[in-house]
Amino acid sequence: MTEQITYALEERIGNPYLFCGREREMNLLLNWASLIPRKISKSRALVGRRKSGKTAIMQRLFNILWSRNSNVVPFYFEVLDPNQLLLDFSDQYIRTFLTQYLSFLTRTPLDNDNESWSWNKVEAVNRDVANNNITEKMNTFLEYFEKGQHHQATTTAFGTPAWFSSRDKVFFVVMIDEIQYMTEYIYKDKQETVQAHRLPGAFHGLVELKVAPMLVSGSYIGWMTQMIQDMFVGGRLKWTPISSQLTFAEGMAAVFRYAEYHNMPVTERSALIINTLTQHDPFYISMLFGSDCP
């Protein structure tokens, strides 16, 4: 990528320089995003084993789209695996969206921890932006939230990107990282006895909207396959496999880049051996250079 990128979202990879290769995947997704204003981009599922680079790809896509400052706005949300109450999950989802949307509108990078803002900060920042739609959506959600109406709160939160698309005349890329966790760790009651195991099904209709297509990821292929078959029937998500391996040439470049970053000189021959032994997998390359072995 030769374009200037502002890293508005702190990437988990650490130093952005360590994002190596992935030219095919990034070209695919950037072309996909460029077609969103034509309303022909279909929602996708990035599927690959853990540590295969899905999060790095999604976060880099976010930062590229944020930097371009066009009418395609990125939204990135990671589903975590601790048990969560559905109301709290919905609150986190919509605050994360509004935080990132206001970050985009004000051209203000997010904090280094990528945390969503409090409602007070969202309201304060929006006073300068003066977006009445944000005020309206906040008030609607908080009314449901304070009354404990989890179904209405969830529906409102999940539908927020599409809602803003029609009112602010923009488009969104809705990225949900590790979406399969939504079937396992979210509960409707504080006692954690009623599981919201079909929660991804709440996106059943939203996933087909071309104004805010979704890009979801999952690390457990069998789990993801079952979820898609059960809750996104009819090919609503385009299966997009992500290999853990770079191309051979990208792997060689990654070896030299990590060697430079760790101040460890390598020759062409030693780089070739490392690239071959690690099967040009950037995770294993990074582990090798980060090890304590001499």
Predicted feature residues:
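P-loop NTPase nucleotide-binding core
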Residues: 42-45, 49-189
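Hydrophobic core positions within the conserved protein kinase catalytic domain
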Residues: 33, 158-162, 203-204
